Amino acid sequence: MNSENLTRAAVAPAEFVLLGITNRWDLRVALFLTCLPVYLVSLLGNMGMALLIRMDARLHTPMYFFLANLSLLDACYSSAIGPKMLVDLLLPRATIPYTACALQMFVFAGLADTECCLLAAMAYDRYVAIRNPLLYTTAMSQRLCLALLGASGLGGAVSAFVHTTLTFRLSFCRSRKINSFFCDIPPLLAISCSDTSLNELLLFAICGFIQTATVLAITVSYGFIAGAVIHMRSVEGSRRAASTGGSHLTAVAMMYGTLIFMYLRPSSSYALDTDKMASVFYTLVIPSLNPLIYSLRNKEVKEALRQTWSRFHCPGQGSQ
C-alpha cells in the first residue's frame, strides 16, 4: 500500500509551484501595474464589443455575429490566465492545485484552438460578403453561422481534451516547479520524468494540423477576396473591403505568429524564460488589442458606439 501511495503521489502531486515571470520584487510590481490595466482593457473592451453588437440592431449580421463571439472568446481567454497571474505577482510563493492546473490547461488550450478555427470561419464570411454581397445574408444563414461556431468549439474542445489528458497521465517526480506563470504544455513536459515523445509528437501534429488547416482556409478566402477587390468598379467598395479584411488579417497575424513560435518547435529549442514574455503577449496583449483593431477601422462599429454614447449620456440628442 505504501509503495502504491508513493507511486500515485509521484504521478499526481497535490499541487504545483508556479515560478512566475521573474523573482525580482520590483519587476513583479512593475508587471502587475502594467498587466492590470491591459487585462481590464481586454475584459471590458471585449465584453463591451459583444454587448454593443447585441444592443445595436444594425450590427445583427453574420459578420458581427462572429465578431461578438470572438470578443467573448477573448474575454474568457484572458480571464483563464490573467486574474491568477496578477494575484501571483504579489505573492511570495505561487501554487496551483493539480486539478486546477489541469482545468486551466484544458480551458486555455480549448479557447486558443477554438479562436483559430473561428478566425478561419470569419475569413470565409468575409469572402462571401465581398464576393456575393446581394446574397450574403442568404448564403451565411443563421444555421450555417451556428454550425461554423459549433464546429470551432468542438475542434477546440477535442484538441484540448487530448493534450490535457495525455499531459496529466505523465509522472511528475522530477520536480513540481513549473517554470511559467500558468499551466502551459511545454513547461509541464519539461518537468516530467516520463517519456514525453508522444506528447511532443501530438502537440506538433495537432497544433500543426489546426494551424495549417485554418491558415490555408484563411489564405484561400483572402485569395478570392483579393481577386474580387481587383475587379470592383467602386472605389468606396474596394476601400471598405480592404479595411475590413485588413483588420481581420492583423488579428490573424498576431495570433498565429505567437502560437507558431510557442508550439510548433521541438522541445530542444524551448527557451522557457523567453516563452514567458511571448505567453504574456498572446494571453493578455492580443485579446486587449482585438477590440481596437476591429473598431477603429470600422465605420459601423464607430457609429454604433457614438449613438450608444449619445443615448446614455445625452438622452435628448440620442432621441432626435
From Swiss-Prot:
Keyword Glycoprotein annotated: yes
Molecular function (Gene Ontology), one example: G protein-coupled receptor activity
Q: Which residues lie on this side of the membrane: Cytoplasmic?
A: 51-58, 125-143, 222-241, 297-320
Q: Which PROSITE patterns match?
A: G_PROTEIN_RECEP_F1_1, G_PROTEIN_RECEP_F1_2
Disulfide connectivity? C101-C193
Its subcellular locations are:
Cell membrane
Similarity annotation:
Belongs to the G-protein coupled receptor 1 family.
Protein name listed in UniProt: Olfactory receptor 5C1
Q: Please name the taxonomic classification of the source.
A: Eukaryota, Metazoa, Chordata, Craniata, Vertebrata
